[in-house]
Amino acid sequence: MKQQHVENCNFSSWYPRFKNVTIRSKIIPLSKEFVDYLKTDGVVLPGKPSSLPRHEDDESDSEEWQNLEEDPEQATVEAPEFNDIDTKIKEAIQELGGEVFPKLNWSAPRDASWISHDNTLRCKSPGDIYLLLKSSDTIDRVLCDAFIHCEDNSTQTHDSFELILRKWQNIYPAMEFRCFVRNNELVAISQRDISNYYHFLAENEDEICADILNFYESKIAEKFPDTSYVFDVYKYADQKCTLIDFSPYGVPTNPLLFTWSELDTEVVPDLLFKVVPSAIGVQPGPFACSRLPQDMVDLTSGADVNKLVDFLNVGNLIRRPGEASDDDS
């Protein structure tokens, strides 16, 4: 994969060509100052100072919070202001019907949906958007290493970032599909929501494949600049399909129910179609660990052996006093 393949999947690169078959969207260029703000640690929303919350119902913590609030330097964090972007976001939200779905050039902050009040990416104000962007590791990777998997990757980074606001759609996850195009041929279709089993998908395989193939051949085929790529599509009940997004063909794009070695097989006799076959075949969602502290993720996955050793040592220290008392008794 080359950097140009990634650039071709940049939203503003493909949207003008496919705007008639995708969701209505607005593109807002981001200033360097705003991008730097997104890269900084911590979640301080623009517009007003961020005060530490009062935990009045928690008596055990009340004294601690009171001490913090009495110190102005600890109680209030100066918030940045981006009035121009703020105004553009408000105008775009109004033009798009009052509710939007945010993303940057390539990715949406799906891993941060847990922090919103309804566990979705539905946003009604600039503050909703800022909170999701600042809470997302996915967005951080887009900003810092968009070309990390490219064979012609260099020290030069992408420096033109955009906020994309898409008109909010109530999408039924079962009808989202990821489609794989190799050498200008649609070779595979995967269920997008692999963390759930939908019994009717396998039963309607022929209809689903026919509708998506027709959409590809009539609306997308040979119109995208690359010969191999991935696109996501939403299928409605009336055979209509809507384009959701484009992604590069290969890592880091998630092949979902396929593997890249399987998709790269020289001969693909027929269009491959995969869905979760039963409740037993359900896989964890790609952001299942996003709600856990990183230390907990490292412990459970074995990613950091040192943390696991420390954890076991602490456990031994905790048990020793009890064990000694048992022996004494």
From Swiss-Prot:
Signal peptide: none
GO cellular component: cytoplasm
GO biological processes: cell division
InterPro entries in UniProt: CDC123
Disordered: annotated segments: 46-76
Compartmental location: Cytoplasm
Keywords: Cell cycle, Cell division, Cytoplasm
Pfam families reported in the protein's UniProt record: D123
Compositional bias (Acidic residues): 58-73
Assigned protein family: Belongs to the CDC123 family.
Function noted in UniProt: Required for S phase entry of the cell cycle.
Alphabetized PANTHER family for the sequence: CELL DIVISION CYCLE PROTEIN 123 HOMOLOG, D123 PROTEIN
Name of the protein this chain belongs to: Cell division cycle protein 123 homolog
Lineage summary: Eukaryota, Metazoa, Cnidaria, Anthozoa, Hexacorallia
